[in-house]
Amino acid sequence: MLAFTLRFIKNKRYLATLAGALVIIAGLTSQHAWSGNGLPQINGKALAALAKQHPVVVLFRHAERCDRSDNTCLSDSTGITVNGAQDARALGKAFSADIQNYNLYSSNTVRTIQSATWFSAGRSLTVDKKMMDCGSGIYASINTLLKKSQNKNIVIFTHNHCLTYIAKNKRGVKFDPDYLNALVMHAENGKLFLDGEFVPG
């Protein structure tokens, strides 16, 4: 009887330990889930926590292109659609709930400039044509922007081929970003590290 009681107590302790471990794992998963492409998913809270440790760089693909959609154009046919502008505005509001302090940049195309403008709702925007050139030199260009921003967080509106290049080069994964998808990087000791894919919420 005593042996049975001891085994029962041990089993209860094991189950309690197992349940606690599952709760911890679930909590971690909610903060850092994994995308099907192999990149960690970083939500707003996780991004804010990362930004407390290092300057973060968030690179967004522009909103829906007018010239590749049947939806109504915002204005210029080389820019974004009305739907794209509204999506960018909603995303910007959600983003700013967690990250208020950042400098804003875009490449020199109408679609990225419009996307950044609607995302930020009045924040000052700096246009940099180097954000259109996406090869090995992209990292030096980003570091230059970080220095100009005095190591503040920065948001960059760029293009799908830039995000695809960075994901492949830094993590060896295939990333085919949709409109307004984004990658999160951070700067540490002059080096850039790819942390994952930004997922609002």
Swiss-Prot record:
**Which keywords are on file for this protein?**
Hydrolase, Periplasm, Signal
Cite the EC number: 3.1.3.-
Provide the protein name.
Lipopolysaccharide core heptose(II)-phosphate phosphatase
Task: Kindly list any coiled-coil regions of this protein.
Answer: none
Q: What is the top-level taxon of the source organism?
A: Bacteria
- Pathway, per record: Bacterial outer membrane biogenesis; lipopolysaccharide metabolism
The answer to whether keyword Signal applies is yes
Q: What is the lineage of its organism?
A: Bacteria, Pseudomonadati, Pseudomonadota, Gammaproteobacteria, Enterobacterales
What this chain does, per the entry, is described as: Catalyzes the dephosphorylation of heptose(II) of the outer membrane lipopolysaccharide core.
Q: Which cellular components does GO assign to this protein?
A: periplasmic space
Membership in a protein family: Belongs to the phosphoglycerate mutase family. Ais subfamily.
Which Cys-Cys disulfides exist here? none
Database matches in HAMAP family: Ais (MF_01868)
A GO BP term, please? lipopolysaccharide metabolic process
Protein's UniProt keywords contain Coiled coil: no
Show the Gene3D superfamilies listed in the entry. Answer: Phosphoglycerate mutase-like (3.40.50.1240)
Cite a single GO MF annotation. phosphatase activity
CDD domains membership: HP
Where does the UniProt annotation place the signal sequence?
Answer: 1-35
Q: Subcellular localization, per the record? A: Periplasm
